[in-house]
Amino acid sequence: MHIHKIQAREILDSRGNPTIEADVILTTGIIGRASVPSGASTGSREACELRDNDPKRYAGKGVQKAVKHVNNEINQALQGLSVEDQENLDRILCQLDNTENKSHLGANAILATSLACARARALSLNQPLYITLNQGDMMTMPVPMMNILNGGAHADNNVDIQEFMIMPIGAPDFPVALQMGTEIFHVLKSVLKKQGLNTAVGDEGGFAPNIQSNRQALDLLSEAIEKAGFRLGEDIVFALDVAASELFNEGFYHMYSENQKFDSHQLIEYYANLISSYPIVSIEDGLDEKDWSGWKQLTTHLGNKVQLVGDDLFVTNPKILREGIAQGIANAILIKVNQIGTLSETRQAIKLAYDNGYRCVMSHRSGETEDTFIADLAVASGCGQIKTGSLCRTDRTAKYNQLLRINELASLPYAGKNILKR
């Protein structure tokens, strides 16, 4: 299981922007391949995504520099090493980069290599990836957070909240959960059409109509759920990704579609009112990533009622998560492998969360590829929840389809309503 060669190439993501794909070729001829996603609303403390900044190619978004780093320094450093020791490989990658945010080699170059090594190991062992990724956690099939109505930075519309998600917690298993979500998605399209609303989709495959308010979005989802024959609050519950850092300006949170602005306390009250009106069980990035005093208030007021997920807040970084845990900030973390840049550091963040009673939600990015690594990692880590977009666009459904394959192989329990237990 030793590395013969590592080579990378520039490919396109789901937004038509360049990203990097790496092949780890073993001495046996086995090839492990992985590609890296890219975010639109990003946390300021994410690991550095290295771009070329050459205006003559891809409007500056090329990744040839990152590709060269893989083909040269990274290839030379890892040649001859075993893929059996993931932590050692990732440690060498971090030492080779030698920056706090992986800005020398690029987190995209490092991550593509890290994930490709893990995939090469699974292929060498002739085992499914989710099996070789498991480190003793109880594996479950995750509840999907299906982003079927998009706003914010993920859509070209006037909706403030970035993601309105449905969670089929009442399903008996993952295939039925996927079926439920898909049926609601198609009914929602007809509901929008009937009201003369746009049925074009955003980056993550959800519909992106211009509507009057965030409450109207939840009302539209409620109507679609009921018309599809499901019970709101029993079969299906809601989750929100506010991406509040995108709404924060000069000390206030601006809900432009509703012509309102809030300070932290007022926005917390706004959420409390929504929670009392709709079966919302999870709010992600409810406040700005730097508004830690506000986050403390939010956690104190609503942390015993809903899951409060830190995305931009924690950026899958164990060091930052540790600070949040110490201060009682949030009660869950979003896991995005490209925010931190290696598989090992991602695992560290997951373990730290579990050890301190925080939940984990596995997540894609808005600029995705056909790579399904996160589906296997969600199952392997037993996190119980996954965000991978809506029920259309192959970059999203690829992850759902991989989860169907895993479910068929493993007959694992579906997390379902267990995610609500505190």
From Swiss-Prot:
It is found in: Cytoplasm; Secreted; Cell surface. Pathway: Carbohydrate degradation; glycolysis; pyruvate from D-glyceraldehyde 3-phosphate: step 4/5. Mg(2+) binds at D241, E284, D311. Binds a second Mg(2+) ion via substrate during catalysis. It catalyses: (2R)-2-phosphoglycerate = phosphoenolpyruvate + H2O. Gene3D superfamilies: Enolase-like C-terminal domain (3.20.20.120), Enolase-like, N-terminal domain (3.30.390.10). Pfam families: Enolase_C (PF00113), Enolase_N (PF03952). Its EC number is 4.2.1.11. (2R)-2-phosphoglycerate binds at Q162, K336, R365, S366, K387. SMART domains: Enolase_C, Enolase_N. Its cofactor is Mg(2+). GO terms for biological process: glycolytic process. Belongs to the enolase family. This is Enolase. It comes from Legionella pneumophila (strain Paris).
